């Protein structure tokens, strides 16, 4: 099993990254704030406008350390990936499948099955653990709707129909998402998914976490030799990691959504960690971003048993394992792609 290394998060807006020997060094002006050996890193995520030196970016690319640049508010800017890895035949197969609507639907259908399955089990867990604190009939109704969609999704062989099912499932799930917020309800409320920009604190936290998860999925896909920009359900768009968005669909609910709910319900995130702009946008403050990133790293270290492989692993390795299973399917080593089904 692959070893999970560290992700270095740079949260200071005026930090500049440079290379010294085999270390990434963080500067603020002329002051050296810290340094970390490249050998312990697998990702660098920077929220600074100042960027990094070409020497550091080259060293990271050479060592397959993925570097991601975001704005301080978490909007994606650019990624440094280095040379493409893996067998060119695998990527050619990926492109052929992507160009074939029926074959694309076969893969995407399993991914969306995983998404709906996992959304349903987030609701079922809440009913099991906190039945007296939620509107149980509403959650039960939404769970039943998701179950109905699961039963019908296997017969779908059209991408537009699949997107329709996915949209209805998301509406049912997010329609009761506010019920999953158990504490700080006077501060955190959810009236529906919104982004670009997020308009409330819950959506601000979700958007930031989805950005981190998308980066992890893109890095995982590239590490096994797949092209993160060529998807099966999310179609080609310049600059969009479409396959990473496909892969993260089944991981949103069990990993990202539950993570954000935990931060709110345990008061790791509070009202003071958010700022409101005059245009209505809501963003994490510097302290809020640091709290979320620290908790995200800890969550990724937590162990689970992979439902398909029946092996224990850290949450942070799940995107890599799913990317590996997808590559095996495309090579013809598996009859179908097995989505991540969490309970």
Predicted regions and their residues:
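Terminal-proximal segments
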Residues: 1-72, 82
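Active-site helix-to-loop segments that bind/position phosphate- or nucleotide-bearing substrates
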Residues: 1-20, 29, 35, 89-343
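A surface-exposed, charged beta-strand/loop segment in the N-terminal or early-internal portion
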Residues: 40, 48-121
